[in-house]
Regions:
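Glycan-recognition and catalytic cores of secretory/periplasmic carbohydrate-active enzymes
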Residues: 1-156
Length: 156
């Protein structure tokens, strides 16, 4: 079973580390390879957005949330694609960023009370109206916003 969100998060950690290590080409390539592979596997071709789990053999997922999309993989993908674009200049990452950003900001935000819903059905409908629980706290969303701001600021 694949969890695209965790792999995408790991990809941007590795890309960041490549920057800290004088733009280490091996780490950069590793981060980009993981990111490319997980974007291809994780993107829902039918409804858009990033699937929470994928089976490597394309078998049905047995988890009860198999038809859901969670907020945090989208947060991580927004950071990862923006960082990949910054360090490569490759337009494919700008396109991925735009696609993920548009999908996430179309479906996750609560336009009336703020914050993001954490759990959507595959088609983008709200599954659980909670915006905070044991698993969803104020971490991934503000981290994404802060990192995106810093990355964009570094591009100017």
């Amino acid at each position: 079973m694949l969890c695209p969100g965790h792999a995408i998060e790991a990809a941007w950690f590795i890309l960041n580390e490549s920057i800290f290590r004088n733009h280490d080409p091996r780490l950069k390539q590793l981060g980009l390879t993981i990111l490319d592979w997980m974007l291809d596997w994780g993107w829902d071709q039918e409804y858009g957005g990033i699937l929470y789990y994928r089976d490597v053999k394309n078998l049905p997922i047995q988890e009860y949330w198999q038809d859901m999309k969670f907020w945090w993989p989208h947060n991580e993908a927004i950071i990862a694609t923006l960082l990949a674009y910054q360090i490569t200049g490759d337009e494919k990452y700008a396109k991925w960023h735009q696609m993920i950003h548009q999908w996430a900001y179309q479906y996750f935000p609560d336009r009336e009370y703020g914050e993001w819903y954490g759990y959507l059905h595959r088609d983008g409908r709200i599954s659980v109206p909670l915006k905070g629980n044991f698993w969803k706290g104020p971490f991934h969303l503000p981290r994404m916003q802060l990192n995106a701001w810093k990355i964009i600021e570094g591009m100017e």
